[in-house]
Structure formats: structure tokens, C-alpha cells
């Protein structure tokens, strides 16, 4: 027997704010229902003789269109999202309207503007896993005995992987006859799953993440970012409002009052696997920096989850092996192509799919190098090389017999090699998140220059500060150029979903 909250039938809206308010109402009712049922279960206070399964479902938004054309007041040249691909019925489940309010509101407004149709909002038939209904600081299930915990599956819906795969993003999803077409890349359970994973891997809650993300594979960059973040907080005129570190430790800008949420922050006893740091702006266009560690598995893992936040761009700042003898230690490499020997995305994104360079990101990175180094023309080209970056899953590729990798890298015209950049770019392509890569040459193993401890430490001290300032400057340029220019139509498929 099911214990359900009241079902809310479809209601039609031509006002985006009203539609969002209804989404909130349905979501809040579902969450409250599951939390109360869990509290009764933990307290063993359910006196009903009949075993009742508590269930609540996510809100749903739907649009129906009769034409492939968009309204005359829409500019089809500038649009890369906000419209459906043709006539039909399109829908998606939604979650966390508190976190996604601005995002949902923009998507709703664009659909109304581009198609002139009504938005239908109702309760869906997709159950909400009880784990995804808990508040950030609630851990009710932790007090359950092993026997009671084993019975959870009989009383509540648990996460179901079948409802959260990436078929839509991968382009392999085929609706059955009579089923609606997707309106977004991610279903609500998939989003909730990643939001919970982000807490685990980064040590910070999703609310702190900003819309521009820098990835690095060295703690040296994080140390410098932390120093810069605290310096910004000491400046009462900084454009940034807060700096957040793992454990949700919040430092507010000088002159700003603390907020209630700050009291929950505490430095963790040890850093999480991929710690994240957030230099925040009031409009969420600040900078999040994540130390992803080493290897393509980490790179795929973190980008799989950050993608549900729909950032405006992510950029890899890391070290690489220079493959050309003409390169010097400390030179920069701006990737305009990738050799994917990482193998972690082969099933989701076939190797025959090219990963294009995105002009908006490339131009911002090149200008940032020029701005920070104060070089131009031939002097700039001397330290900045544009070319193909190869990424491998074999850290000791140099030891393979017969010069096998060297031959492939030469045939591909690669100028640099690392273990993460191609993965981050490929997942950006797969998830329609604008991406870029700017690496710094830290060794040249094909030419006898390998990393040694003393040399490496000196090199890091010399270059990390400048490289990070280049990355931050690139983000500033992207922000100044506007988000409308950033989301490239190069990332759209033939039958793209409407949501960004």
C-alpha cells in the first residue's frame, strides 16, 4: 500500500515565475512527505498494521508544439538553447528549485518567448529516492539499526540507476512510441545523484559552486588560489563576496556580515579526494577551482557531476610533457585538438567524434596569456604554442617498448601530453559545457629533460602564480564577453534538448 502526498494535476502557465512557483510547491510537498515518513520510521512510530510504502514524486514540466518554427521575435542566429527541435511533446523532471531557480526561470522564459506555448507543470510519476529528500545536515538513517536499515527498501524508494543514465547526453536515447521527448540533458534523479556525489568528492555543498570552473592536477595551484582568495576577502572593494573552502568554511569579504549558514562550516580532518574552492560573486559568475588529482578517471568522475550544475565554462590548467625539442620548460600550450588515449569515455563518446576547439574560449585564453605576460607578436608565440594535446591513461608511457606511443604522438602532430585534458574537453563536448585547456610544460621526457625534485620545486614556484593569474584573467574575459556568446552552437546535436 502506498502512502502518497496529494497528486497535483497539470496546470498551464504563460508566466515563467508562476510556473516556477508551482514547481517549488510540488517539490516542497514531496520532500516534506518523505522527511516526515522517514522520521516516523526512525522513531518506529508508524502504528498502522498495514505496511505502507512512502512515496513522493518529482515535479515535471512539459511543453507541446505543433511547429518546428520559432516565433518571429526570436533570433535563431544567436540561440544555442531555449527552443525545441521540432513539433511534439517534450518534458523533464525537475529537482532542487531552491538551487536551480535562476536556471529554471531562464529556460521557462526562453520556451515561452521562442514558441508561445503554455508550460504544463504537474506531479510526475518518477519517484524521488528518500536519500535525496534529506536536508544537508540531516542524517536520520544513521541512527537505524542494521535490521531496520535493511527494511528501508520495503518502505521507501531508493536510488534507481535505470532512471539516471546518460543516454540523453550521449545521444543514444530513443523514446518509445508514445513517450515524450526529453526537454533537458539530465533527469531529476540524475541531478540529485550528482549533487550528492559533489559533496562527497569535493567537500563542499553544490550551493557554493560558481558558473566558471578551473581544474588543476597540482596542489601548488590550489595553494596559490587560496592565498588569492583570502587576499580578495581582505579587500572591501573586491568584486567577490565570499571564499569557500572544503568543509564549507566560509570567509566573507571585509565589511560583509556573516550569514547563518557560515556556522555549519568546519575544516575537515583530511582533505576530500578532489577538494573544491569557490571564489564567489553575487551573481554566481565567480570561480570554482578543483584539484582533480592525477588521471582520466578522476577527470571524468568530477566532470560527470559538475555538469549537472550547467556551468558556463570549464578550463583545465595543469602541467604537461612537452613533446617538441623547441619547447622550453615553462612554455604554455593552448590545446586546439586532442588525442584521446584516456579510454574512460570511449563507450559514451566514440573516438571518431572530433572534439573541436571553441573560438570563444581559445581567444580568451590567448588574450589572457598576452595580458599577464605583457608579450605580443613573435615574443608571445615564443612562449605560447597552439597545437594538439594527447592524453593517456598510462602514467609511465615512456617505458613502453618499441617507441610505440612516440610514433603515434608524432603522427598526430601532438605538442604536449598529459592525463586529463582530453577527458575534460571530451566531457565538456558531451555535456555541452564550453571547455578549454591551457597547459604548462614541466618536463620533456622525449628529449632527456625529466622531472627531478629540486628542479620541479623551483619550476613550480616560478610558474604557478603566473599560470593561475592567466586562468583567472581568461575567466574575467569570458565573463565580460557575455554568456550569450559563450554557449556555442558547435555543441548542439541535430535534435538538441531545449534546456541549456
Predicted regions and their residues:
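Accessory terminal and edge-of-domain segments that mediate assembly/interaction
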Residues: 1-313, 321-500
Amino acid at each position: 500500500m502506498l502512502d502518497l502526498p496529494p497528486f497535483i494535476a497539470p496546470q498551464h502557465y504563460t508566466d515563467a515565475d508562476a510556473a516556477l512557483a508551482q514547481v517549488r510547491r510540488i517539490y516542497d510537498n514531496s520532500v516534506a512527505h518523505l522527511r516526515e515518513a522517514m522520521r516516523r520510521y526512525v522513531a518506529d512510530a508508524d502504528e498502522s498494521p498495514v505496511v505502507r510504502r512512502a512515496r513522493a514524486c518529482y515535479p515535471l514540466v512539459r511543453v507541446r508544439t505543433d511547429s518546428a518554427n520559432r516565433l518571429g521575435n526570436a533570433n535563431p542566429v544567436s540561440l544555442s538553447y531555449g527552443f525545441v527541435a521540432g513539433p511534439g511533446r517534450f518534458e523533464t523532471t525537475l529537482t532542487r528549485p531552491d538551487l536551480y531557480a535562476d536556471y529554471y526561470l531562464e529556460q521557462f522564459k526562453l520556451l515561452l518567448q521562442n514558441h508561445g506555448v503554455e508550460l504544463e507543470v504537474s506531479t510526475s510519476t518518477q519517484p524521488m529516492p528518500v536519500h535525496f529528500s534529506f536536508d544537508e545536515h540531516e542524517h536520520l538513517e544513521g541512527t537505524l539499526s542494521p535490521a531496520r536499515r535493511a527494511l528501508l527498501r520495503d518502505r521507501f524508494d531508493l536510488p534507481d540507476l535505470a532512471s539516471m543514465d546518460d543516454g540523453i547526453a550521449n545521444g543514444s536515447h530513443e523514446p518509445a512510441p508514445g513517450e515524450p521527448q526529453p526537454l533537458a540533458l539530465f533527469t531529476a534523479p540524475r541531478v540529485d545523484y550528482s549533487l550528492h556525489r559533489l559533496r562527497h568528492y569535493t567537500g563542499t555543498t553544490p550551493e557554493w559552486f560558481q558558473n566558471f570552473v578551473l581544474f588543476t592536477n597540482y596542489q601548488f595551484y590550489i595553494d596559490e588560489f587560496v592565498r588569492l582568495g583570502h587576499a580578495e576577502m581582505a579587500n572591501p572593494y573586491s568584486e567577490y563576496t565570499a571564499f569557500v573552502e572544503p568543509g564549507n568554511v566560509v570567509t566573507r569579504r571585509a565589511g560583509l556580515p556573516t550569514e547563518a549558514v557560515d556556522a555549519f562550516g568546519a575544516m575537515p580532518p583530511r582533505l576530500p579526494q578532489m577538494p573544491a574552492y569557490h571564489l564567489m560573486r553575487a551573481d554566481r559568475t565567480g570561480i570554482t577551482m578543483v584539484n582533480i588529482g592525477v588521471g582520466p578517471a578522476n577527470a571524468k568522475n568530477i566532470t560527470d557531476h559538475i555538469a549537472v550544475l550547467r556551468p558556463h565554462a570549464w578550463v583545465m590548467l595543469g602541467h604537461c610533457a612537452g613533446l617538441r625539442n623547441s619547447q622550453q620548460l615553462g612554455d604554455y600550450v593552448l590545446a586546439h585538438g586532442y588525442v584521446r588515449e584516456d579510454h574512460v569515455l570511449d563507450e559514451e563518446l566514440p573516438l571518431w567524434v572530433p572534439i573541436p576547439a571553441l573560438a570563444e574560449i581559445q581567444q580568451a585564453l590567448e588574450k589572457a596569456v598576452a595580458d599577464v605576460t605583457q608579450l605580443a607578436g613573435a615574443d608571445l608565440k615564443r612562449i605560447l604554442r597552439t597545437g594538439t594535446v594527447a592524453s593517456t591513461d598510462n602514467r609511465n608511457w615512456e617505458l613502453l617498448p618499441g617507441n610505440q606511443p612516440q610514433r603515434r604522438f608524432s603522427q598526430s602532430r601532438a605538442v604536449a601530453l598529459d592525463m586529463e585534458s582530453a577527458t575534460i574537453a571530451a566531457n565538456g563536448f558531451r555535456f555541452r559545457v564550453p571547455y578549454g585547456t591551457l597547459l604548462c610544460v614541466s618536463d620533456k621526457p622525449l628529449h632527456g629533460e625529466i622531472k627531478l625534485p629540486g628542479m620541479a620545486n623551483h619550476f613550480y614556484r616560478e610558474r604557478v602564480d603566473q599560470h593561475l593569474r592567466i586562468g583567472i584573467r581568461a575567466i574575467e574575459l569570458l565573463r565580460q564577453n557575455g554568456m550569450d556568446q559563450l554557449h556555442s552552437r558547435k555543441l548542439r546535436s541535430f535534435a538538441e534538448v531545449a534546456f541549456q
